[in-house]
Amino acid sequence: MSKTKDQRTAKTLEKTWDTLNHLLFISSCLYKLNLKSIAQITLSILAMIISTSLIIAAIIFIASANNKVTLTTAIIQDATSQIKNTTPTYLTQNPQLGISFFNLSGTTSQTTAILALTTPSVESILQSTTVKTKNTTTTQIQPSKPTTKQRQNKPPNKPNNDFHFEVFNFVPCSICSNNPTCWAICKRIPSKKPGKKTTTKPTKKPTIKTTKKDHKPQTTKPKEAPSTKPTEKPTINITKPNIRTTLLTNSTTGNLEHTSQEETLHSTSSEGNTSPSQVYTTSEYLSQPTSPSNITNQ
């Protein structure tokens, strides 16, 4: 009921505030006009009344707003007090047990939780127990297993050549003296001397360039062999001629009237056969070359 009353009063105050503002504006406009003295006096009185009513309305409005603020702060305080009463735990740390939770206020019924962390070597089991008292109830929770695993201690490094104190998974051949079964089972201990590492340089493979060839069928016409007819060369048998010349001269006249030359060429072949005789004139005889062996006495 109180909330509804506050809302009604707030609405009425807003309405009166608006109406009074309008009245002040109207009265100021009328006062500026040149009216009679009685009207001006009445307008001034109305303006005074309106201004005082505005002041009163403002005071009432501020007071109602303060009441609302106080109500909200009271509600917030009640809520915080309830939260404080219901919050059960405060966080502290214990170096031996780990992390533990406990509550300082023991007036109301509360729940307290204690978390005990054991050492990592011992496995813990989840245990939850509830203890009821007159005012408090406590619960204890322990984790099941630790999350971290124990690391195994590595044995110290031993010298490479001292094999007397090492435990082998096989039988070394140094123990076997003359036992054949021992020699069949044993293994030789490798020498752990650091050897030089052979660094192999990568060899570059030769790059083979391949050129694409157009394999097209070659259409070549076969060349025609020139047909040559065998020409029969004439066999010329040249025989050295035996020239016999007779010159007829006319001694009486002294002028060469008639010259006749009879040339008889007797050609003999390699077989001893004679060729037919030839008779030349003097002009033909002089034009042919003569050899000294073939010229006979005229």
UniProtKB/Swiss-Prot annotation:
- The identity of this protein, by name, is Major surface glycoprotein G
According to its UniProt record, what is one Pfam family this protein matches?
Answer: Glycoprotein_G
Q: Where is this region: Binding to host heparan sulfate?
A: 187-198
Question: On the Extracellular side, which residues?
Answer: 67-298
- Site annotation (Cleavage) points to 65-66
**Compositionally skewed regions (Polar residues) per UniProt:** 140-150, 266-298
What InterPro entries has UniProt attached to this entry?
G_prot
Q: Where is the composition biased (Basic residues)?
A: 192-215
Q: Which cysteines are joined by disulfide bonds?
A: 173-186, 176-182
Question: Which residue windows does the record flag with biased composition (Low complexity)?
Answer: 242-256
What cellular-component terms does GO give this entry?
Answer: extracellular region; host cell plasma membrane; membrane; virion membrane
Membrane-traversing stretches: 38-66
Please provide the record's keywords in A-Z order. Disulfide bond, Glycoprotein, Host cell membrane, Host membrane, Host-virus interaction, Membrane, Secreted, Transmembrane, Transmembrane helix, Viral attachment to host cell, Viral immunoevasion, Virion, Virus entry into host cell
Source species, domain of life: Viruses
Cytoplasmic topological domain: 1-37
Keyword Ribonucleoprotein assigned to the entry: answer is no
| Similarity comment | Belongs to the pneumoviruses glycoprotein G family.
- The biased composition feature labelled Basic and acidic residues covers 221-232
Q: Which organism is it from?
A: Human respiratory syncytial virus A (strain rsb6190)
Task: Write out the GO biological process terms.
Answer: symbiont entry into host cell; virion attachment to host cell
**Which stretches of sequence are listed as region Disordered?**
132-161, 192-298
Record: glycosylation sites: 70, 72, 80, 86-87, 92, 100, 103, 105, 119, 135, 137-139, 144, 147, 199, 203, 219, 231, 235, 237, 250, 253, 269-270, 275, 282-283, 287, 294
